[in-house]
């Protein structure tokens, strides 16, 4: 875009908050303010970064304003300068130069030298030299040679008292060197009001309190976008007009980026679309050996035609190649999300949702009208995803492949902590502040939280803290790596977007996140991780070894009634997607009986259907308590599978098309507006089109209003049917394993931690409730992983030799041996050394163990603390004493030379052992901690989880239990859901906001919680609405139980 004819100034040096902890304004704010002030253009020049340019570009396009792309640099052995891209080639040179500096340094840093500026091609970039107070001619002459007719001296004046002298010095310098001068302003914020925040960011960056910074702070607030009239009073007009000449030469826009996908996956003799068609044909033959249904063939042909027209075939070939590699290595993977709407993806083996089984909507995935790249999310086993990532790096090279960034922003807790430190609050006060703010702390409740920390909100220092914190929340803190979004290019990626090192070794990331990529319409491959895939693969292997033959996903029988009966009882701990408190509450009400019921089960326990008032109508119709009717056959076709209630995003899109006349592209825009309206609004234009379209087609006003109300309820929380269908497949397989092979399933879950909703303690308790014999950690039996052992030991040798899963033919109900991975402070490497030594024979004593296995004292004491030495040293106290006293052999003395008399050590009591088990291993096979307190609890009128079912609805009851998890869904209006556990089962608590507010400390901190509340029992679901909460952790002093909170 050309510069405005009326404007007389373009700002060429502006930093946003993507110059982390320097800039004090969002890119959008800078662009909007520059446009408001009448600037001709704005150059966003974050330090060695293009991380904020996409956001600035989007705002500039909206406002019809010119944005210049550039970056500020401080050469390690040279000057400070700004580089501006003149055209597409210059942009590529700039991005590559940023990459050069970032790849040479640790994450978050960069390193550039004068020599690199000389050798790196930058012939399509403009340089603005920003001299220090005493500029030297040599540097200027050097830059003038490097950038002939493209180098300026930047003059920056801030009313600091020496402006006149500085201007004259730089004018003389320019005359000597023949370099023109241009006005710049080193902008750090869009408005003066951000100066206090900019000072605070400086303190955070330097790690020192504001009061100690002195000259490290800017002397005044002049580094903001200032009115042109004001600039005309402090700069010679020629310097302002020079900025326009530079701006005119910078004609690049991010709209010029044209992304090209790798082409090497196409063999000779084929075009990309021909090869994709051939792979699809091969996959179709494998999926349907007897021939694909006509419906599927038509759908595949439609998809291939559209994929070819949109030139997306290289993207599909790349994802197919990644999936093919994973499967060749035995890594479980499965596509999900909107890609599961694609029959081509199913044929290619990317997704597992059979298009012949479900009526899916391809337009949810790819739309000609939308003309945006498709999004294919593929989940891989979380323990083996790195193999897939490194394969991508090897195949395409680090110069062509990198992960997308993830932008880490300030939240309330982190903002308060950093601001408080900058303001000089004491460490203890800062820790108190952080404790009283939970993860979902919101600014509106901060005064109350501060009062709880002993800080009055009317205190001036506290008011300052609050004001700065509220400005800082939402600011970018740093770039991290996306969970798995890969960007792969046909050529060098660094000419397209800067690439930098990630914190994790062997990883590189680009400087844009997924929203930036989507905004520019650029493709990424999502290589995601899923713990349940790891657990399923391990469980299938255990089952297969027990049966003496491989057992795969294809061997899991479909639609097993026993599986659905188990789920109807809400017996779903560990089962994928249906193990949460909310899902367990829904299972007895929905009573799934088929795969598609599971699809609905997963989707209906979501904020969208709940807020759209779709849950109750569906359940009453499913139970036969309410008739199902449809206003037309077209609507019936869309809603029949969900009994007339729209539950999925695809149904909303289909309704808009069949009932209101939307095109597929318009329906997809409606979906996107739904996803954003809570944050941005934007549904209103669709309301009129929906209402008018339905009226024109003869639908009643009441029906039209009901549909629109449900669409609003969906908001950003509507669940795609394709996504739910993908997850339902894994939910069924995990439920089948739990139902028929509980030992293998529990073993796999424990060996895949951390994952899922429950920790090891709850998984072990659940396995025992399902009849699994769980055996303790023991150095003579345990490996690193938990293992399966036969329940009938065939010979004495097996007492010490791990028989593992290969020996399970001797018993159909294997026992679960806990592994050394549960021992706090014990490493997998130490476990491997122990297992290797044990192959020579069982350990006879703790001294024998210490002699044969190179373990340090800390590792031995960790084993003793976890009671893993009970077979060698007797009870825990004695084993710990022996572990602390062992002597490692030396070259001179092969055996200990002195025997110390054994003291009389008291055997620990049962409660002491239980507490020690939890502390050292996070679980116990002894009596449940609550059973130790049961007599005391009974005297005080506490009921067990089992007895609570006998209490009538609406009655008051008292219960107590270990806290398993705490949840506060975003759409629950502040309600907290807590699950506690006693020796008979689990109890689900509902804590209303007022109760949570009044009793926050007990709610958020207690490991052992006593609750008095009202019983709520309906349709086979039981809750206790909490009235009073009490932390009774002192009843078992020292017991620490790790709960899974606010996941």
Swiss-Prot record:
- List the Pfam families hit by this protein, alphabetically: DNA_pol3_alpha, DNA_pol3_finger, HHH_6, PHP, tRNA_anti-codon
Source organism of this protein record: Methylococcus capsulatus (strain ATCC 33009 / NCIMB 11132 / Bath)
Q: Which reaction does it catalyse?
A: DNA(n) + a 2'-deoxyribonucleoside 5'-triphosphate = DNA(n+1) + diphosphate
What does the UniProt function comment say about this protein?
A: DNA polymerase involved in damage-induced mutagenesis and translesion synthesis (TLS). It is not the major replicative DNA polymerase.
GO BP terms in the entry: DNA repair; DNA replication
Q: Which PANTHER family match?
A: DNA POLYMERASE III SUBUNIT ALPHA, ERROR-PRONE DNA POLYMERASE
Write out the similarity annotation. Answer: Belongs to the DNA polymerase type-C family. DnaE2 subfamily.
Indicate the enzyme's highest-level EC class: transferase
Question: Know the name of this protein?
Answer: Error-prone DNA polymerase
MF terms in GO: 3'-5' exonuclease activity; DNA-directed DNA polymerase activity; nucleic acid binding
Superkingdom of origin: Bacteria
